[in-house]
């Protein structure tokens, strides 16, 4: 009980002292405080670490020049060609395995390693006498 009262008094003292401080808008003309406030209000851009696939090339900036647009167009065309070729890497193995399954197989959407339909299994294990 005594500990709860001490915590309430401490919180009240902290809230009163924080109300007595300067508002966030006034910085007394300090350039460091103004820079800090500006950095806090700007949206942050988080960058991801490069993947292990290889080094990344810096993307060209769009200044509206014809050469840069042509470069981006060529990169887009190359990407679309690769996308049309199909999947590569780990997904190609999965695609080959799914294609080798009998075409009359009824549960293609649930075929992955380790999947088991427990309802069907339990119904097959127990023979019901009627």
UniProtKB/Swiss-Prot annotation:
InterPro entries: CCK-like, Gastrin/CCK, Gastrin/cholecystokinin_CS. The precursor is cleaved by proteases to produce a number of active cholecystokinins. Residues 21-63 are annotated as: Disordered. Keywords: Amidation, Cleavage on pair of basic residues, Hormone, Secreted, Signal, Sulfation. One of its GO terms (biological process) is digestion. It comes from the Eukaryota. This peptide hormone induces gall bladder contraction and the release of pancreatic enzymes in the gut. Its function in the brain is not clear. It also decreases food intake and regulates gastrointestinal physiological processes. This is Cholecystokinin. It comes from Gallus gallus (Chicken). The lineage of its organism: Eukaryota, Metazoa, Chordata, Craniata, Vertebrata.
């Amino acid at each position: 009980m005594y500990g709860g009262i001490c915590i309430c008094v401490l919180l009240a003292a902290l809230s009163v002292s924080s109300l007595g401080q300067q508002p966030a808008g006034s910085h007394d003309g300090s350039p460091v405080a103004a820079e800090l406030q500006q950095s806090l209000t700007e949206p942050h851009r988080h960058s991801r670490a490069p993947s292990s696939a290889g080094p990344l090339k810096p993307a060209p900036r769009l200044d509206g020049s014809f050469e840069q647009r042509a470069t981006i167009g060529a990169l887009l065309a190359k990407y679309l060609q690769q996308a049309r070729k199909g999947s590569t890497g780990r997904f190609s193995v999965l695609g080959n395995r799914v294609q080798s399954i009998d075409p009359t197989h009824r549960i293609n959407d649930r075929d992955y390693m380790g999947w088991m339909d427990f309802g069907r299994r339990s119904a097959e294990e127990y023979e019901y006498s009627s």
